[in-house]
Amino acid sequence: MTQRDIFVVGTARTAIGTFGGSLKDVPNTQLATTAVKAAIARSGVAADAIGHVVMGNVIPTDVKDAYLSRVAAIDAGCPIETPAFNVNRLCGSGLQAIVSAAQAIALGDCDIAIGGGSESMSRGPYFDTSARYGARMGDAVLVDYMLGILHDPWEKIHMGITAENVAARYGITREQMDELAVASQQRAAAAIAAGRFKEQIVPVEVKTRKGVVLFDTDEHVRADTSVDALSKMKPAFKKDGLVTAGNASGINDGAAAVVLAEGGRVKALGLKPLARLVGYAHAGVEPAYMGIGPVPATRKVLERTGLKVSDFDVIESNEAFAAQACAVIKELGFDPAKVNPNGSGISLGHPVGATGAIITTKAIAELHRTGGRYALVTMCIGGGQGIAAVFERV
């Protein structure tokens, strides 16, 4: 099969809402549709030319979410003939959706596809496993689905404990973690103040008692955070532990979408490519150390693409926890100045199924802002996985 070049021709993301914040009453399907519709409009591609739509999602919040990609596609203007499907690779879902869309193009299933992700953690449901057939005498239990997916399925430990494990194994100190967290907050605040995200963000219409308002600014950022303030926070998951609410990612809401097109179609339709997908890779690691997943995934993508770490001008390595973010930087020899230059999961937030598409959007935008050539997008994945992709500015 002939190798097909795949280009990014349009991106869009919503601003990221904090847990129980501005987006708490916005349906997940609306977030997804908003991002997909904007990405199509920005790409210059006609909606009826989209050959496939793939959306990442982890936490279903409504029965419609089972149809998330299909709802987003049709409500964004794609014809009913456009196929769509959801993917769930947990924290890597948004990036996996982009990879899956690219695979559809690479295999000749279509020439243009959309990959993205959408998550409303604020609307995560509680469910009762005993309700369908009747509970026995005594109390029944409601399971917090949102909190549940943040636990390892084997050890039954919170992902925060896996971060503690990584810190212990790789010699990461509390001071290093808090310093990274503060740097993330400062970078995100500076990016917002400078308006760097304005071209990325599509406003979300939010219905309030006073009418419809537009949500267009990331709201999770804590610009006034300091190392001194973080150092006083108590461990969140383990007595005498290092992981706190201040050096961990947020629980958030948001969506993003990326339009991909095959090189021949880019030329034929006169589209303006933003970046080329150079390669991608996945890896598995010990579930109890899931945060180190980006290390083998990145090493795989370096081997496949023939690139070196020093070739990357921008590195979007999602901050699930400062512990794992520090360990990944240490193990791969990243230049900290190139890593998450505009903030990441700790400061901006981590709407799990959407984050991969959000940081892809950020990485490509930063390449164009700075004139860099290559960007790495990578993230750890609950259950013990890693995913990585490389994009080249064009």
Model region roles, listed by residue range:
Residues 89-119, 167-196, 257-264, 329, ...:
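Active-site-proximal alpha-helical scaffold in enzymes
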Residues 38-51, 166-171, 266-270, 299-313, ...:
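Phosphate/pyrophosphate-binding loops at sites that engage ATP/ADP/AMP, CoA/4′-phosphopantetheine
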Residues 7, 12-14, 24-29, 33, ...:
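N-terminal extracellular/periplasmic Venus flytrap/periplasmic-binding protein-like
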Residues 13-41, 59-62, 85-99, 122, ...:
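Active-site pocket-shaping loop/turn-to-helix segments
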Residues 57-112, 153-158, 224-250, 331-358, ...:
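Conserved catalytic cysteine-centered active-site region
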Residues 112-169:
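Flexible glycine-/small-residue-enriched beta->alpha junction loops
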Residues 161-164, 197-200, 207-208, 278-347:
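Active-site pocket-lining segment
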